[in-house]
């Protein structure tokens, strides 16, 4: 029962061939068996899950269910939900029980979705391996010696391991797309402002965006329909008419113009990634799409620009964690200033501290113009590059990551780890939508994904193209043993 896609489970629930309680119970049993080794979930509450499932069954019986009623979903630990611990995988918030619910979570609860639990992540979403968690690393379900990617590694791992039909992630510099690639699932980062950020703990406010993660593009489209929408509680939420993100699922690929950025197809990619890209290019050509070479010249500069800006925003956002009102507080201190220092030294992990220090430095007097202001100018140039390309094509095809998932504990420097985000970061700098879908496997049997990038508000077109690729391939149907 846990092998169904979201769409398949929805059909069975609506036709009463299975009940929401049966479906939730099957997932809870699978989680109890497999999660201790995987470490994808860090909070489970069976009583709450089954209570939501019973309510969903009542709604289905009364005939007022939606396509998502009774479908279980996992939430990255960054989303607040009343009565659930929302720790952001940090010691700082290990004892924080949320008193309110994020708008995007509430939207899914209103549809009758059933909460399975909270998934592991890099602390405060800072990282791309899921090793920076207070609760320990999540394993890649395809090979437990490898990372699942990050920061939404727990969400990607539980969907790939069939411990959830769908999950929510957040994407600041690739945190939905990169773990989706490493775990062999589909995930989309929508246009900035499409999904409310209210109740999603902030890392870098001008980059963060929530998105769905599932087995297929069709499942992601169904989820995004429920997730997206204007929210007056979020000042960056976009006031637009409600969209149907499933509307282009049946649009053929014939005639679609796909750009191939030459900067993304260079020597930095492993042979496995280039093979996955070629698989996708061959499929697109066979379906009648037109492929053209394009250029995104600021690609290499996107990494320093991103890490300056995101760290600056993080240092500001994380200043609220000081031990005064909630979260961890140092046990022994002499005065208020010492309490602040000890609390933050004890509560934050090393990567979070590193980014706070970088951010504080680039915002400090004498360095603001040299770093922060220059990075903002670069951000605009990156966005302009994309607009030049989208004048010539409908979508961009690119790698998601330069390699398949690295090993847990790989001896990489912070800079080497940051460089692995080279193909995802520019999308966040520009605020564009982008989706990752499975496109092959490495020689070692690890999944490899590719990325479809669209212009602002082109989610339906991206999802439609991804769905057509998945109708003509079976990479998304593969699952770990």
UniProtKB/Swiss-Prot annotation:
Give a short account of what the protein does: Allows the formation of correctly charged Gln-tRNA(Gln) through the transamidation of misacylated Glu-tRNA(Gln) in organisms which lack glutaminyl-tRNA synthetase. The reaction takes place in the presence of glutamine and ATP through an activated gamma-phospho-Glu-tRNA(Gln).
UniProt GO MF annotations = ATP binding; glutaminyl-tRNA synthase (glutamine-hydrolyzing) activity
Q: Which reaction does it catalyse?
A: L-glutamyl-tRNA(Gln) + L-glutamine + ATP + H2O = L-glutaminyl-tRNA(Gln) + L-glutamate + ADP + phosphate + H(+)
User: PROSITE patterns attached here?
Assistant: AMIDASES
Q: Keywords for this entry?
A: ATP-binding, Ligase, Nucleotide-binding, Protein biosynthesis
Per the record, the GO terms for biological process are: translation
Looking up Pfam families in the UniProt record yields: Amidase
What HAMAP family would the database entry show?
A: GatA
Name used for this protein in its record? Glutamyl-tRNA(Gln) amidotransferase subunit A
Family to which the UniProt record says this protein belongs: Belongs to the amidase family. GatA subfamily.
């Amino acid at each position: 029962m846990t092998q169904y896609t979201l769409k398949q489970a929805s059909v069975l629930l609506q036709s009463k061939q299975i009940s929401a309680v049966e479906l939730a119970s099957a997932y809870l049993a699978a989680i109890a068996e497999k999660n201790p080794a995987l470490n994808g979930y860090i909070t489970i509450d069976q009583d709450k899950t089954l209570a939501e499932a019973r309510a969903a069954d009542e709604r289905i019986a009364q005939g007022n269910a939606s396509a998502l009623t009774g479908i279980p979903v996992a939430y990255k630990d960054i989303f607040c939900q009343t009565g659930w611990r929302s720790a952001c995988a940090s010691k700082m918030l290990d004892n924080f029980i949320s008193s309110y619910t994020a708008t995007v979570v509430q939207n899914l609860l209103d549809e009758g979705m059933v909460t399975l639990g909270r998934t592991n992540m890099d602390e405060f979403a800072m990282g791309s391996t899921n090793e920076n968690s207070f609760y320990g690393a999540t394993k890649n379900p395809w090979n437990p010696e490898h990372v699942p990617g990050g920061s939404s590694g727990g969400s990607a791992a539980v969907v790939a391991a069939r411990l959830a039909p769908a999950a929510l992630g957040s994407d600041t510099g690739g945190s939905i797309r990169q773990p989706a690639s490493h775990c062999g699932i589909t995930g989309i980062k929508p246009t900035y402002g499409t999904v409310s950020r209210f109740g999603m703990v902030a890392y870098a406010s001008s980059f963060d965006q929530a998105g769905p993660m599932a087995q297929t593009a069709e499942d992601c489209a169904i989820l995004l329909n429920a997730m997206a929408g204007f929210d007056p509680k979020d000042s960056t939420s976009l006031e637009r008419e409600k969209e149907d993100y499933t509307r282009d699922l049946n649009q053929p690929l014939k005639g679609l113009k796909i750009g191939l950025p030459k900067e993304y197809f260079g020597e930095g990619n492993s042979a496995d990634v280039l093979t996955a890209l070629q698989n996708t290019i061959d499929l697109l050509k066979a379906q009648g799409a037109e492929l053209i070479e394009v250029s995104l010249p600021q690609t290499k500069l996107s990494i320093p620009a991103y890490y300056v800006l995101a760290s600056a925003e993080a240092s500001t956002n994380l200043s609220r964690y000081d031990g005064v009102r909630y979260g961890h507080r140092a046990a022994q201190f002499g005065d208020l200033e010492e309490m602040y220092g000890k609390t933050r030294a004890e509560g934050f992990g090393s990567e979070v501290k590193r980014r706070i220090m970088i951010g504080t430095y680039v915002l400090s007097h004498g360095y603001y113009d040299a770093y922060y202001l220059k990075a903002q100018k670069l951000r605009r140039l990156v966005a302009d590059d994309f607009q030049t390309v989208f004048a010539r094509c409908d979508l961009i095809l690119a790698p998601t990551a330069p390699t398949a998932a690295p090993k847990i504990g790989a001896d990489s420097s912070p800079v080497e780890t940051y460089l692995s985000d080279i193909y995802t970061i520019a999308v966040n700098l520009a605020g564009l939508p982008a989706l990752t879908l499975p496109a092959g496997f490495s020689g070692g049997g690890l999944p490899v994904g590719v990325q479809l990038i669209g212009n602002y508000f082109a989610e339906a077109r991206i999802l439609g193209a991804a769905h057509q690729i998945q109708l003509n391939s079976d990479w998304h149907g593969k699952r770990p043993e």
